[in-house]
Amino acid sequence: MNLRIILTVAALLAGTGAATANCYEGLGCDDSQYFTTQALQQGTCQQLWEVRNMIYQQNGYCFQTNRAKQSFSNDGCYINDQASVRLNVYERKNVATIQSVEKAKGCK
């Protein structure tokens, strides 16, 4: 799974201001397909963090941490409270599954 290349392309596209889903080889599209635990386990902690935060970015979240601000642009963001970000059913489940895998892997 070449998630790094796909993430790079998705990050470039996210900067265009278009609210579009990110699709990942081996995972699917984050707003219309459920990611499987098995597929997510193939990713590194960094990749999991990036995929999870791409979901929040495409839904208008303004990142608060220095790490996230350096990795994602806050241009065009409009929601400061992560709990207020409106995610659809697929996105909510995918975030939860990613967080579960991150926890199992001991990601920080």
Where are these regions (language model features)?
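Compact alpha-helical subdomains of small soluble proteins
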Residues: 63-108
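Bacterial N-terminal signal peptides that target proteins for export
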Residues: 1-7
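Acidic/histidine-rich, surface-exposed loop or edge segments in extracytoplasmic proteins
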Residues: 27-37, 77-82
